[in-house]
Every structure is written in structure tokens, then in C-alpha cells.
Design a protein with these regions (language model features):
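Conserved acetyl-CoA-binding loop-helix of GNAT-fold acetyltransferases
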Residues: 48, 54-67, 93-94
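A short, acidic/glycine-rich surface segment
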Residues: 26-33, 102-108
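Conserved GNAT acetyl-CoA-binding A-motif
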Residues: 69-81
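Conserved beta-strand-loop-alpha-helix junction that forms the acyl-donor binding cleft
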Residues: 79-89, 106-110
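Conserved beta-strand in the GNAT
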Residues: 9, 15-26, 30-31, 42, ...
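Conserved acetyl-CoA-binding loop of GNAT-fold acetyltransferases
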Residues: 92-102
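Short hydrophobic/aromatic beta-strand element in the GNAT-like acyltransferase core
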Residues: 5-9, 19, 45, 78, ...
Length: 125
């Protein structure tokens, strides 16, 4: 049986230093139409502790996550990024997230809203 999300953690010397989540069920993701289905996972919640940023730890976790999802039978992964986050967009493009799927608006529990661009990548088998 498949869960609704799959967390990934980067651990160094017993300490979680980075994390990401693969959303496997659209019922827990905003704007999920076209982003999540039985063969597509939506990637979110990317975090790295500041003192470990820029050292390649998250890249290693990200590559592992993509390979693991491919091995689990997923054919595509998607993610969202705010349009002004140009540095992150360049990183995602580098990883092959070049298919623009759609634009949308996401909201937080406090009422804050953000514009988001959604991109996809095919996982090669």
C-alpha cells in the first residue's frame, strides 16, 4: 500500500541537515491537478540547515530522491517555485525541470498567498 507522502532526510553525523518530501496523493497538495497522479510525484518542502547550504548535501539527497522515486515506478516528478526565486529556478532547470506545467497561487494558514510556477521532469528508465 502506498502512503500519501514520502519524506527524505539528509543525515550527517547523526543530525538531519536537509530534507525534502515527495507528495504522492493530490489531496494534500494545493493546485495538484496535473502535478500528482499514480505515476507522478510532487516534490516539496526542500530545506537545508543554513550552515550546510552550498556544500552539495541537498544535491546528493535530491539525486537520491529522484532515483528512489524512479525505482518505485514513478515516471515523472513535478515541483513549484516562486517566479522571483531565479537562483532556485536555475538549479531546477539544471536538474531537468524544464517542462512548464502551469502557474498558480498557493496560500498559507495565516492567509499569505504566493504565486508559483510549476515545472516537471520525466524520470528516465
Amino acid at each position: 500500500q502506498q502512503g500519501i507522502s514520502l519524506p527524505y532526510y539528509g543525515i550527517l553525523d547523526g543530525k538531519i541537515i536537509s530534507e525534502a518530501t515527495a507528495i504522492l496523493d493530490g489531496s494534500i497538495a494545493q493546485n495538484s491537478d496535473g502535478l500528482v497522479d499514480e505515476k507522478t510525484a510532487y516534490l516539496s518542502a526542500f530545506r537545508t540547515i543554513p550552515e550546510y547550504q552550498g556544500k552539495g548535501y541537498f544535491s546528493k539527497l535530491f539525486r537520491y530522491m529522484l532515483e528512489d522515486l524512479k525505482n518505485r515506478g514513478y515516471e515523472k516528478v513535478t515541483l513549484g517555485v516562486e517566479p522571483e526565486e531565479t537562483e532556485n529556478k536555475e538549479i531546477y532547470f539544471h536538474y531537468g525541470f524544464t517542462e512548464h506545467i502551469k502557474n498558480g497561487v498557493e496560500s498559507y494558514p495565516d492567509g499569505t498567498t504566493i504565486e508559483v510556477e510549476y515545472f516537471g521532469k520525466q524520470l528516465s528508465h
